[in-house]
Amino acid sequence: MKRIIPFGREFGSGGRELGRRIAEKLEIAYYDQEIITEIAKRTALSEEYVRRIEEKRPVMHFPIHTGHSIYLISEPTFYPDFSIYTKQHELLRELSRKSDCVIVGRCADYILREQKPVRIFAYADMESRIKRCMERRPEDEHLTEAQMKKRIAEIDRSRAKYYAFFSEQKWGARENYDLLVNTSGADIKKLSSALCAYLEAMFE
């Protein structure tokens, strides 16, 4: 049985680190930044541009979702963004066929739903998320806790809109995942070990 683990996460929940540690412990592939790099190559766009666009809802005026046909559009001002989404969906399917893997975000739980993945979503209380983000912010970034809280909320809204647009489902809703993990105050390293035991049981 192919071990495909899409990993959704609230911003600042530690979901990215948790997914990476799980991949390391299970000795399977881990995809996050690597997806941005590959999409940039395939679209001839900069990695920075892809990073800004990839988990934001497309600016389009007609419905598109992965469960139905994806229509190409002729309007050149829309094409670069749209190309990112179509290439990303293609790449996620390629990666999942290639090997067992953890894929962070990018609506992978929905896009790869036919492969029967074990879908995980990490969340945490706002206090824990602010603390984590403040501890990991770049040295030249001087946001206050109030400003960080605002950024967290903005990123979460963006991810929720992206997810709803492509899946027509609610981001973070328990019915869309196999396991929801509250990382508030948790030791991510220890938590990853517990989750690996769960995953091994699920994939038997």
Protein language model regions, located:
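Short, amphipathic alpha-helical "lid/cap" segments that border enzyme active or binding sites
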Residues: H89, I188-C196
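ATP-dependent small-molecule kinase phosphotransfer cores
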Residues: A40-D100
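RNA pseudouridine synthases
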Residues: L95, G105-I120
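Glycine-rich phosphate-binding P-loop
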Residues: P6-R20
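Conserved phosphate-donor/acceptor-positioning beta-strand/loop module used by diverse small-molecule
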Residues: E114-M134, L143-I155
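Small-molecule kinase domains that catalyze NTP-dependent phosphoryl transfer to phosphate-bearing small molecules
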Residues: M60-H65, H142-I188
